[in-house]
Structure formats: C-alpha cells, structure tokens
Regions:
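Glycine-rich flexible loops
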Residues: 2-261
Length: 261
C-alpha cells in the first residue's frame, strides 16, 4: 500500500522558513499500483512522454520484484489495473500484458543501486533536444538547483538496451547520479520515493527548455553561487517534492478519475 506522508496539524507559531507542518493531502488512500498509474498520467499530461515510449519501475517490495507499465499503452492510458509486476529478471509475474523489451535498463540499475527505488525513463522534447547535441543544461534558475551536482551525460549511444549485459554497462556509466541524459536518446531519473522521482522528472524538461532558450539568446546566464544552489536543492527535495506530488494527484483525480481503476 502506498503510504501518503503524514500531515501534521498547524501550530500557532509561524514556519519561519522551515518545513511547513500543515499541507493539503491527496485526500484518498492509494495502492502502489494506483500511485504508479497516477505517476504515468501526471508526467504524460506534463509533456514528459513520447507517445507509447518510456517506462517507470518501482521496487516497492524487498523481494526484487518491480512494478512497471505494460508495453503498448500510452502513459495517458495507464490505469492501476494495467500495472504489471516483474521479477528481478524482467519476467512478468502479475498482470495481463507484456512489458517493454528494454526492461534491462531498469532491472540492472535497480540491482546496482538499491537506493534507486523508482526509475523513470522517457524522451521529453527539450531533454532530447539537448541530448541530441550532447549538451548538459546550465543552472540558470533556482529550480535548476534540484539537479546541482546530480546531472550527468552518457555521451555514447549504443542503441536499444536489449539484454542484461547492455543494461549492466549502462548502470555502471550512470553510477550514483540520479538524473542522467542519454545522448541521442532521453533521460533516466531515479529516486528513493515515487514523490521525488515524479518531481525530478516533471521538472527536467522545463529546466532544459530554459537552458535551450538561453542558448538562443547568445548570452551567459547570471551565476548562482554554489552555497545558494546547495541550499535550494535541499529545500526543493524536502519541501517541494511531496506537495508537488499531492497537488498533481489531486488535479489528476478531478480530470482522470478512471486512473484508479
């Protein structure tokens, strides 16, 4: 069962720059399958997906199995009942559909990175645009601090990750980074929670679009000091990811209530 973070009651003293104590909840209890379906549709509605491409896996148990989307459904279509479960080798053990042939991207990365409970992969437009020319976006806005020292480029494109050996090789090149642009391909984003994974993924394309527009201007962005980037990254992870997720799911349930079915 997906456990929504506890919401404490409001106290009389002001927050004063700290973490808010009372924030609006999702308002419904979600199973893990429902939460993952909400992740697919939220990211799709935000322009993160490319038609039927892309996959998200969630190691929601400690038995090596993964929740994953079925092959052939667009992210906008995924409902909770469509979500599949595969074992550590990508064999479907629950669900009515087959899964992506590129599941080795996920299985091998999960093996190498126990902290990466959620792995998101797709080809959002502006990420892919910069990936096509092998350029990492510069941090030119405070939200870009989310990726400070946590964004890298795998500069060689080896085609489809169609077997475990290629998956292991990619996992080695990804290393400990949580946000990796794959040259001529797309993005892999990881996190230890579904909330943070979706927030990182949902924010990356705007980050890349801003960098692209700055390149078009032909001007260098104003520098943001390292100490400020570090503080902003901490604040975004601790204070923004959870409330982004709750708000995104609330909005989704108003427009796409069938996502829970």
């Amino acid at each position: 069962m997906y456990d929504e973070p506890a919401v404490a009651g409001r106290e009389s003293d002001p927050v004063g720059g700290g973490k808010p104590r009372a924030t609006p909840p999702i308002g419904v209890d979600l199973t893990n399958e429902q939460a993952l379906a909400c992740a697919f549709r939220t990211l799709a509605h935000g322009g993160f997906s490319e038609n039927m491409a892309g996959h998200i896996t969630w190691a929601d148990r400690d038995d090596g199995s993964l929740l994953i989307n079925p092959w052939g459904l667009w992210w906008e279509e995924v409902s909770a009942s469509d979500v599949c479960r595969v074992d550590a080798d990508g064999v479907v053990i629950e669900g009515k559909w087959d899964v992506t042939p590129a599941y080795h991207i996920h299985t091998e990365l999960h093996r190498r990175r126990p902290d990466a409970r959620v792995v998101v992969h797709n080809h959002p437009y502006y990420v892919t645009l910069l990936a096509a020319v092998g350029v990492l976006p510069m941090i030119a806005h405070q939200t870009g601090s989310l990726y400070d020292d946590d964004l890298s480029l795998v500069s060689e494109y080896d085609g489809e990750v169609g077997d475990a050996e290629l998956g292991r090789d990619l996992a080695v090149r990804i290393g400990e980074c949580n946000n990796v642009i794959l040259a001529s391909h797309g993005i892999i984003t990881t996190a230890d929670t579904i909330e943070l994974a979706v927030y990182r993924a949902a924010s990356i394309d705007r980050f890349c679009r801003l960098a692209y527009d700055i390149l078009l201007l032909g001007r260098d962005p104003l520098p943001i000091e390292k100490s400020i980037r570090v503080a902003m990254q901490k604040a975004l992870v601790e204070r923004a990811a959870g409330v982004y997720w709750a708000g995104a799911v609330r909005k989704l349930l108003r427009t796409d209530p069938d996502v829970l079915h």
